[in-house]
A protein has these predicted regions:
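Short coil/turn connectors at secondary-structure junctions
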Residues: 50-52, 76-78, 175-176
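Cofactor-binding beta-sheet edge motifs in enzyme active sites
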Residues: 15-16, 27, 114, 122-127, ...
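A broadly structural signal marking compact, well-ordered functional cores
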Residues: 22, 44, 54, 171-176
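Iron-sulfur (Fe-S) cluster-binding segments and ferredoxin-like electron-carrier domains
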Residues: 29-60, 86-110, 121-137
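Immediate flanking context of iron-sulfur cluster ligation sites
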Residues: 12-28, 60-83, 98-117
Length: 176
């Protein structure tokens, strides 16, 4: 029975960064990378991932491209509520590993499997398209806070961008 258990269910119970929304492959919030290609983890069974390289948002925390992607999302104000953000980040990471300077249409296609109810996607698209134009050490928040009308980084942005923001569905009773 173990091979038929859903990967999304395993992640939902054991790690909190990969968010499981619809559990039907429609929303994309549970997107992970399998052999560097985005997949909805809720549609994958444990039997389908044997001998595959699986990456979750937690597993890419040291990846330089991921670090730059988080910074670009923060600069562009691309993270809103945070439920879809890990899935969007993982889809964008797969694209950027193949193409460091994607065209808008390529970004739109790469992100088309993840639904976001909070944004019009433009900030997200801009963040992905501009990720390799920023530097890892660029500190925008301290500079922007000195100017009226400039964007400041969200105080809760880091948790939304790395998947550590905890939502109601992420809680489990002790010893469950």
């Amino acid at each position: 029975e173990v091979p038929s258990r859903g990967l999304g269910d395993v992640y939902k119970r054991q790690i909190k960064g990969t968010k499981v929304g619809c559990n039907a492959g429609d929303c994309g919030s549970c997107t992970i990378l399998m052999d560097n290609n985005p997949f909805c983890s809720c549609l994958l069974t444990l039997g389908k991932i044997k001998n595959k390289k699986i990456e979750t948002i937690e597993g890419v925390s040291e990846d330089k491209q991921f670090i730059l992607l988080k910074k670009s999302f923060s600069i562009h104000g691309a993270a809103q509520c945070g439920i879809c953000t890990p899935g969007i980040i993982m889809s964008a990471l797969a694209l950027l590993r193949k193409n460091k300077f994607p065209k808008k249409e390529e970004v739109e296609f790469a992100l088309s499997g993840v639904l976001c109810r909070c944004t019009g996607y433009q900030k997200i698209i801009n963040a992905v398209m501009n990720v390799n134009k920023i530097t890892e050490n660029k500190n925008t928040s301290s500079n922007n806070m000195k100017e009226v009308g400039k964007r400041i980084e969200r105080i809760d942005g880091e948790k939304k961008l790395d998947g550590t923001e905890i939502f109601g569905d992420d809680f489990s009773p002790e010893n469950s």
